[in-house]
From Swiss-Prot:
<dbReference type="GO" id="GO:0005829">
    <property type="term" value="C:cytosol"/>
</dbReference>
<dbReference type="GO" id="GO:0008855">
    <property type="term" value="F:exodeoxyribonuclease VII activity"/>
</dbReference>
<comment type="similarity">
    <text>Belongs to the XseB family.</text>
</comment>
<comment type="function">
    <text>Bidirectionally degrades single-stranded DNA into large acid-insoluble oligonucleotides, which are then degraded further into small acid-soluble oligonucleotides.</text>
</comment>
<dbReference type="Pfam" id="PF02609">
    <property type="entry name" value="Exonuc_VII_S"/>
</dbReference>
<comment type="subunit">
    <text>Heterooligomer composed of large and small subunits.</text>
</comment>
<dbReference type="InterPro" id="IPR003761">
    <property type="entry name" value="Exonuc_VII_S"/>
</dbReference>
<dbReference type="InterPro" id="IPR037004">
    <property type="entry name" value="Exonuc_VII_ssu_sf"/>
</dbReference>
<dbReference type="GO" id="GO:0009318">
    <property type="term" value="C:exodeoxyribonuclease VII complex"/>
</dbReference>
<keyword id="KW-0963">Cytoplasm</keyword>
<protein>
    <recommendedName>
        <fullName>Exodeoxyribonuclease 7 small subunit</fullName>
        <ecNumber>3.1.11.6</ecNumber>
    </recommendedName>
</protein>
<keyword id="KW-0269">Exonuclease</keyword>
<dbReference type="GO" id="GO:0006308">
    <property type="term" value="P:DNA catabolic process"/>
</dbReference>
<keyword id="KW-0540">Nuclease</keyword>
<keyword id="KW-0378">Hydrolase</keyword>
Amino acid sequence: MARKPASSQDFETTLAKLENIVAHLENGDLPLEEALKEFEQGVQLAKLGQERLQQAEQRIQILLQKTEDAPLNDYKGNDYEGNA
């Protein structure tokens, strides 16, 4: 019986499981009921992967906004020639 995807797994694990399911389904040698269960799990994994990508995109947008809003100051440290 196919397991439901854990919501805490990372994107790479989700993608690997989804690729494995796709390979099984493309083989065409699964009985109908098992193929349907695999397909259902694949849909859940695809949804989870999409959510992970959207979360990552939102985090990137937040980081970029913080960077754009931050003032740029001249560096006051030593230069490469040893001068202060």
